[in-house]
């Protein structure tokens, strides 16, 4: 989807795209800034951007509004074009390809599913959907998901996932899968392998950055130097992603 917006003055545009028939099914939530510099060029106040939807519902609702006031008085839509998403070739192991389908189905439905156990038809993948994830003493954990590296079973927090966009849910699920797939307990290899898969599928880079910052910003009291370095590594990987399958990623 290509969108062209003409702003009358500097402001921040809010964009929200969601399934019109289901609750908590946002495919994109985005802030698009229209800064003062934009009004000094040859085409003042005009900006184009693309909203990719490698995964979309039958009825997609698109809302655009002024982030400050919630109205549409400060801009007009000059372009709104639909384009077919090009087919993409994704390099991954056969079980990862099967997991992609399972993860996409769960990510789409997680906003309205009740808690419980959800598994794939072949029984290879299982998600335990919990109100919140707890430690052995019953204390709530801030993590949105965690993986048993021996079985591949994933625990997911409904409290967290119900607030995330569908792409953010996929970033988390792909990350968790690679803890089992590699296998590794280290965050960086799981981060980068999961992100590569997410980006290879054609999902938006912006939502990948949101996934990282949103999760850590939700609990700033737990963010340390290691977390900040992790965010830098992730953002650097996203910025330098070329779409070329790199089988020798430096993730050690």
Regions found by a protein language model. Name each.
Residues 2-132, 251:
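A metal-dependent hydrolase signature that marks the N-terminal structural subdomain at the beginning
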Residues 86-95, 159-161, 178-185, 221-223:
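Second-shell loop/turn segments in exported
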Residues 203-252:
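Long, well-structured alpha-helical subdomains associated
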Residues 165-171, 210:
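Alpha-helical scaffolds flanking conserved acidic
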Residues 110-123, 182-186, 201-213:
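Surface-exposed patches in mature extracellular/periplasmic domains of secreted proteins
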Residues 159-163, 176-189, 193-205:
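Catalytic Zn2+-binding segment of zinc metalloproteases
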Residues 96-104, 174, 187, 191-195, ...:
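Extracytoplasmic/secreted envelope proteins and their assembly/folding machinery
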Residues 128-166, 177-180:
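Active-site scaffold of zinc-dependent metalloenzymes
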């Amino acid at each position: 989807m290509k969108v062209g917006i003409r702003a009358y003055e500097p402001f921040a545009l809010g964009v929200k795209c969601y399934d019109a028939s289901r609750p908590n099914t946002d495919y994109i939530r985005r802030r698009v800034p229209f800064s003062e510099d934009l009004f000094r060029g040859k085409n003042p106040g005009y900006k184009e951007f693309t909203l990719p939807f490698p995964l979309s519902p039958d009825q997609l609702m698109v809302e655009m509004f002024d982030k400050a006031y919630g109205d549409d008085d400060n801009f007009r839509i000059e372009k709104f074009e639909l384009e077919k998403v090009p087919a993409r070739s994704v390099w991954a192991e056969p079980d990862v390809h099967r997991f992609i389908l399972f993860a996409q189905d769960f990510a789409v439905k997680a906003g309205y599913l009740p808690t419980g156990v959800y598994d794939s038809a072949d029984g290879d993948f299982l998600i335990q959907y919990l109100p919140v994830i707890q430690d052995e003493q019953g204390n709530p954990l801030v993590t949105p998901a965690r993986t048993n590296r021996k079985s591949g079973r994933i625990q997911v927090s409904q409290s967290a996932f119900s607030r995330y966009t569908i792409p953010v849910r996929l970033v988390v699920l792909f990350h968790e899968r690679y803890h089992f797939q590699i296998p590794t307990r280290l965050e960086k290899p799981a981060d980068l392998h999961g992100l590569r898969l997410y980006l290879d599928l054609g999902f938006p880079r912006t939502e990948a950055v949101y996934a990282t910052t949103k999760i850590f910003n939700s609990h700033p009291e737990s963010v340390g130097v290691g977390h900040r370095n992790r965010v830098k590594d992730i953002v650097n990987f996203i910025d330098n992603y070329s779409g070329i399958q790199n089988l020798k990623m430096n993730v050690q």
